[in-house]
Amino acid sequence: MRRLIPVLVAGLLASCAGPRSLEVKQFVLRDTGADYGEDAMVRSEKLRRLHGAIGVKEQAERLGQYYTVLWKDDSQGPVRVIFEYQQGGSGSLIKREVRDFDPTAISGQADFSVVGENFRNKGRVLAWRISLVRNGEEIASKRSYLWQ
């Protein structure tokens, strides 16, 4: 019993930890068919990404990779989320997308996507890095394994 108490205390303390300052969720939309044998969460995400695309051509334009960035920072000042990535067909070229947020915001969500012609011509994203910058200072960053 005495050995169990420290484990329970450690578990309670770990569950009280605040949310991470930067979280990245990735989704790859490979096809437009609604396969009901898939996991319900995957099928739901696929349908969400295809919502509003009526024709086959519109649906094909949405095939690609999606990145959802959730961030939280309690300080004040201009906020910028930067998405840098390299694609298979673009060699060592690093592409960059930026989302700016209100200086009073303490949390937010930024959505990035590599879809359509960009995805078809340049290929899939091989390496990426996402940075959270506030007041010109990098607060947090996440990167893929292949990012250098």
Give short role names for the model-derived ranges:
Residues Q59, D73-V79, N121-G123:
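A short beta-turn/strand-edge loop motif at beta-sheet boundaries
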Residues I139-Q148:
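Short beta-strand elements
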Residues M1-C16:
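Sec-dependent bacterial lipoprotein signal peptides
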Residues A14-G33:
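Bacterial Sec signal peptide processing site at the extreme N-terminus
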